[in-house]
Amino acid sequence: MAIFNKCHALFFGFLVFAIVGAAGYSINQGDYFQHQYTFIVVKSLLLFLSFGYAKWFDMISFGILSKKQLLLFIGTFLLTVLVNIGYHTFFSVSSGAAIQHLEETSNGLSLSFIVSVTVLAPIQEEFIFRGILQGAIFENSWLGLGLTASLFSFLHAPYDVPSFFYYLLGGLLLGFAYKKSQNLWVSTLVHMSYNSLPLLTYL
């Protein structure tokens, strides 16, 4: 039964990754200035349904943050900021994700891009990486945390070893937040807050 549940979670996680991504691209064709409200509503609805399904089958764990979890969120977020500052002091980070971000912002910021980067993408990534992979499949083990963080880094398409370790550190911190809290909203809020920081430079 345990193996069936893990296969079920793995299949569902892949399905969410494929469907949500394909739905978003089919709406705007990669142009965040097109069909903005439709893009936001459809992706939000798909993620909402995904969370409901996963919660129904006990694949993920989330709820209102306790005081301890709130402190964990604040501490993890501050640590990610410090790691980011320290890492960029010694290394340059280059990746496909970073290049895509620069290309999207070169023509200005659209509402759908802002919502995608700061809300939808963090929710989707935390749902798949921390909720499904680390939690449901690897049962929140330390090995699962490390493997999931490595996959998280790889899928951000780093161009070199320092860039790989940059995203790996981020994945490890997010994974640690979920492992210690057993609440997916903790790592998701950290991810949202961190992704919001670069956009402040455009204000």
What is each stretch, according to the model?
Residues 1-15, 40-41, 56-86, 137-143:
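Interfacial transmembrane-helix boundary/kink motif in multi-pass membrane proteins
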Residues 5-55:
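Alpha-helical transmembrane segments in multi-pass membrane proteins
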Residues 8-12, 40-41, 70-74, 111-115, ...:
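Hydrophobic alpha-helical transmembrane segments
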Residues 32, 58-121:
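Juxtamembrane helix-loop-helix connectors linking adjacent transmembrane helices
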Residues 51-60, 177-180:
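Structural signal for the C-terminal ends of transmembrane alpha-helices
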Residues 123-128, 132-133, 154, 158, ...:
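Active-site His/Glu-centered metal-binding helix of metallohydrolases
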